[in-house]
Protein backbone atom coordinates (compact mmCIF):
# COMPACT_ATOMS: atom_id res chain seq x y z
CA UNK A 1 0.00 0.00 0.00
CA UNK A 2 1.15 3.52 -0.62
CA UNK A 3 -0.07 4.63 2.78
CA UNK A 4 0.47 1.38 4.67
CA UNK A 5 1.20 1.00 8.35
CA UNK A 6 4.40 -0.89 7.58
CA UNK A 7 4.99 -3.93 9.74
CA UNK A 8 2.33 -3.21 12.35
CA UNK A 9 -0.45 -5.73 12.84
CA UNK A 10 -2.75 -3.39 14.76
CA UNK A 11 -3.45 0.29 15.18
CA UNK A 12 -2.29 0.23 18.80
CA UNK A 13 1.09 -1.25 17.86
CA UNK A 14 1.42 1.59 15.34
CA UNK A 15 0.40 4.36 17.75
CA UNK A 16 2.84 3.00 20.35
CA UNK A 17 5.72 2.74 17.89
CA UNK A 18 8.87 4.72 17.31
CA UNK A 19 7.57 5.65 13.83
CA UNK A 20 4.50 7.28 15.43
CA UNK A 21 6.76 9.21 17.81
CA UNK A 22 9.01 10.31 14.93
CA UNK A 23 6.03 11.62 12.97
CA UNK A 24 4.76 13.49 16.04
CA UNK A 25 8.18 15.09 16.34
CA UNK A 26 8.74 15.86 12.64
CA UNK A 27 5.28 17.18 11.72
CA UNK A 28 3.32 19.83 13.60
CA UNK A 29 -0.20 18.79 12.54
CA UNK A 30 -2.15 15.56 12.72
CA UNK A 31 -5.52 14.44 11.37
CA UNK A 32 -7.45 11.19 11.42
CA UNK A 33 -10.24 10.30 9.02
CA UNK A 34 -11.97 7.12 8.03
CA UNK A 35 -14.16 5.85 5.26
CA UNK A 36 -17.82 5.81 6.30
CA UNK A 37 -19.28 2.29 6.16
CA UNK A 38 -16.31 1.30 4.02
CA UNK A 39 -17.16 -2.33 3.24
CA UNK A 40 -20.87 -1.62 2.86
CA UNK A 41 -20.12 1.22 0.42
CA UNK A 42 -17.91 -0.73 -1.97
CA UNK A 43 -19.59 -1.07 -5.34
CA UNK A 44 -18.52 -4.39 -6.88
CA UNK A 45 -18.43 -3.03 -10.44
CA UNK A 46 -15.61 -0.71 -9.29
CA UNK A 47 -13.14 -3.54 -9.90
CA UNK A 48 -13.94 -3.44 -13.61
CA UNK A 49 -12.96 0.25 -13.64
CA UNK A 50 -9.70 -0.47 -11.80
CA UNK A 51 -8.73 -3.36 -14.06
CA UNK A 52 -9.54 -1.42 -17.22
CA UNK A 53 -7.54 1.62 -16.06
CA UNK A 54 -4.52 -0.46 -15.08
CA UNK A 55 -4.40 -2.56 -18.23
CA UNK A 56 -2.18 -1.23 -20.98
CA UNK A 57 -4.57 -2.35 -23.69
CA UNK A 58 -8.16 -1.76 -22.58
CA UNK A 59 -9.35 -4.23 -25.25
CA UNK A 60 -7.60 -6.95 -23.23
CA UNK A 61 -9.50 -5.88 -20.12
CA UNK A 62 -12.84 -5.99 -21.92
CA UNK A 63 -12.06 -9.48 -23.18
CA UNK A 64 -10.78 -10.59 -19.79
CA UNK A 65 -13.05 -12.49 -17.47
CA UNK A 66 -11.18 -11.40 -14.34
CA UNK A 67 -13.43 -8.48 -13.46
CA UNK A 68 -16.52 -10.56 -14.22
CA UNK A 69 -15.29 -13.30 -11.87
CA UNK A 70 -14.47 -10.85 -9.06
CA UNK A 71 -17.83 -9.13 -9.49
CA UNK A 72 -19.75 -12.42 -9.45
CA UNK A 73 -17.90 -13.77 -6.41
CA UNK A 74 -18.54 -10.55 -4.50
CA UNK A 75 -22.21 -10.57 -5.44
CA UNK A 76 -22.61 -14.28 -4.62
CA UNK A 77 -21.29 -13.84 -1.08
CA UNK A 78 -23.45 -10.74 -0.62
CA UNK A 79 -26.88 -12.01 -1.62
CA UNK A 80 -26.52 -11.08 -5.32
CA UNK A 81 -26.08 -7.39 -4.44
CA UNK A 82 -23.50 -5.23 -6.23
CA UNK A 83 -23.56 -2.71 -3.38
CA UNK A 84 -21.35 -3.60 -0.44
CA UNK A 85 -18.82 -6.23 0.43
CA UNK A 86 -19.73 -8.52 3.30
CA UNK A 87 -17.70 -7.78 6.43
CA UNK A 88 -15.80 -10.65 7.98
CA UNK A 89 -14.24 -13.00 5.44
CA UNK A 90 -10.55 -12.47 4.71
CA UNK A 91 -11.47 -12.50 1.01
CA UNK A 92 -13.56 -9.37 1.56
CA UNK A 93 -10.69 -7.61 3.29
CA UNK A 94 -8.30 -8.54 0.46
CA UNK A 95 -10.76 -7.30 -2.14
CA UNK A 96 -11.33 -4.07 -0.20
CA UNK A 97 -7.56 -3.64 0.06
CA UNK A 98 -7.21 -3.79 -3.73
CA UNK A 99 -9.63 -0.88 -4.06
CA UNK A 100 -8.16 1.09 -1.15
CA UNK A 101 -4.60 0.71 -2.47
CA UNK A 102 -5.77 1.92 -5.85
CA UNK A 103 -7.33 4.96 -4.18
CA UNK A 104 -4.13 5.50 -2.11
CA UNK A 105 -2.06 5.56 -5.28
CA UNK A 106 -4.40 8.01 -6.98
CA UNK A 107 -4.41 10.28 -3.90
CA UNK A 108 -0.61 10.32 -3.80
CA UNK A 109 -0.43 11.15 -7.52
CA UNK A 110 -2.93 14.00 -7.07
CA UNK A 111 -0.96 15.40 -4.12
CA UNK A 112 2.24 15.29 -6.16
CA UNK A 113 0.50 17.24 -8.93
CA UNK A 114 -0.34 19.85 -6.27
CA UNK A 115 3.38 20.09 -5.46
CA UNK A 116 3.27 18.16 -2.19
CA UNK A 117 5.74 15.39 -1.53
CA UNK A 118 5.96 12.60 0.98
CA UNK A 119 7.81 12.56 3.40
CA UNK A 120 8.98 16.19 3.04
CA UNK A 121 5.54 17.80 3.47
CA UNK A 122 3.47 14.99 4.97
CA UNK A 123 3.12 11.31 5.85
CA UNK A 124 -0.09 9.35 5.48
CA UNK A 125 -0.75 5.92 6.94
CA UNK A 126 -3.81 3.78 6.37
CA UNK A 127 -4.96 0.78 8.39
CA UNK A 128 -7.91 -0.78 6.58
CA UNK A 129 -10.34 2.19 6.47
CA UNK A 130 -8.64 4.44 9.06
CA UNK A 131 -6.31 7.13 7.67
CA UNK A 132 -3.69 8.93 9.78
CA UNK A 133 -2.22 12.16 8.39
CA UNK A 134 0.85 14.03 9.62
CA UNK A 135 1.66 17.35 7.93
CA UNK A 136 3.77 20.49 8.27
CA UNK A 137 0.85 22.93 8.06
CA UNK A 138 -2.94 22.90 8.51
CA UNK A 139 -3.23 23.96 4.85
CA UNK A 140 -1.42 20.77 3.78
CA UNK A 141 -3.60 18.70 6.10
CA UNK A 142 -6.74 20.20 4.57
CA UNK A 143 -5.41 19.68 1.02
CA UNK A 144 -4.80 16.01 1.81
CA UNK A 145 -8.28 15.53 3.27
CA UNK A 146 -9.90 17.29 0.29
CA UNK A 147 -7.88 15.09 -2.08
CA UNK A 148 -8.97 11.97 -0.21
CA UNK A 149 -12.61 13.11 -0.38
CA UNK A 150 -12.56 13.90 -4.11
CA UNK A 151 -10.67 10.73 -5.03
CA UNK A 152 -12.77 8.41 -2.86
CA UNK A 153 -16.03 9.87 -4.21
CA UNK A 154 -15.10 8.63 -7.68
CA UNK A 155 -15.32 5.12 -6.21
CA UNK A 156 -18.52 5.86 -4.25
CA UNK A 157 -16.70 6.02 -0.90
CA UNK A 158 -17.14 8.88 1.56
CA UNK A 159 -15.42 10.02 4.73
CA UNK A 160 -17.19 9.79 8.05
CA UNK A 161 -17.48 13.43 9.11
CA UNK A 162 -18.24 12.40 12.69
CA UNK A 163 -14.85 10.71 12.97
CA UNK A 164 -12.79 13.55 11.47
CA UNK A 165 -10.20 14.65 14.01
CA UNK A 166 -7.44 17.23 13.69
CA UNK A 167 -4.93 18.64 16.18
CA UNK A 168 -1.42 19.89 16.65
CA UNK A 169 1.02 17.12 17.47
CA UNK A 170 1.98 16.96 21.14
CA UNK A 171 5.73 17.35 20.72
Question: Which role does the model predict for each range below?
Answer:
Residues 21-128, 133-142:
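Conserved polymerase palm-domain catalytic core
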Amino acid sequence: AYFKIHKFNSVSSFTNSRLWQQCNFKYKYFAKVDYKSCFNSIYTHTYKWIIERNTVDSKEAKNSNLFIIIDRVLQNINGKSSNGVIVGPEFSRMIAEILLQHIDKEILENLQIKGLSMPKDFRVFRYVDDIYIFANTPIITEAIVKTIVSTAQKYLLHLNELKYYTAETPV
